[in-house]
Amino acid sequence: MYVIGKLEERLVEYTVINNIAILAFDDGKANAVGPQFLDDIDAGLDRAQAEQVGAVILRGREGIFSGGFDLEEFKKGVELGMTMVGRGFDLLVRLYSFPLPLVAACTGHGVAMGAFIIMTCDSRIASRGNFKISLPETAIGMELTPLLVALTTARISRQHMTRVALQSEVYNPEQAVEAGFIDEAVEADLLDARAMEVALKLANLPQAQYAANKLLIRANTLQAMNDNLAEMAKR
């Protein structure tokens, strides 16, 4: 086990099993996406690429994958809050274009930024249970950015797009499969084994072609996401 980073409320563990890297995040709370979380996930992705692993699994803690951005960071001032948001959006682009196969092991609730991270992954498996997966932006009075809309449009089924992105409908894991948030839901005690099974299968595909074809089939979405990042950088 390699601990990527640890501050007061942040811990990301990097492990490699069967040449599959597992990035497991657990802050003991909501797995909020804040500056240290972003540092640690980026470091883990860098390490996975440097070690040339076959695939990467992103895993939350039991009961929650991630509850979204760290609201405490916004209380420190607009500039710090917007810097965190910009870095979070950079992470979404990196994940969605990541050259290695990327598997989400959704261990529980996946809300807001947590749900967007799940959507960036190539294969997404969730634990069954009384968990919420949703985009609450409308419900909490926030506007979606073009970057988020592009990602959501690419992943969420057309039949559910209005309910997901506009009406902030809350889905349980089984419902989230139909909506397009995730690909399959399994019993909690089977989640890690199933995520590893999928990761190993993807790792056996030709890596160069996997990376190239990922960029090709996601080119339009990534262009829209990067265009929005460029606009944000001008502000």
Give the positions of each predicted feature.
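A short acidic, glycine-rich active-site loop
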Residues: 76-86
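Short, active-site-adjacent cap segments at secondary-structure transitions
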Residues: 63-66, 110-112, 220
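Glycine-rich phosphate-binding loop at the start of an alpha helix
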Residues: 68, 82, 89, 112, ...
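Amphipathic alpha-helical segments at domain termini/boundaries
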Residues: 2-24, 164-204, 212-224, 229-235
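Crotonase-fold acyl-CoA enzyme core
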Residues: 96-205
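Histidine/acidic residue-rich metal-binding segments in metalloenzymes
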Residues: 34
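A structural preference for short, pocket-lining loop segments at secondary-structure junctions
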Residues: 18-26, 37-78, 94-104, 123, ...
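Hydrophobic alpha-helical segments that mediate membrane insertion or helix-helix packing
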Residues: 23, 41, 58, 117-118, ...
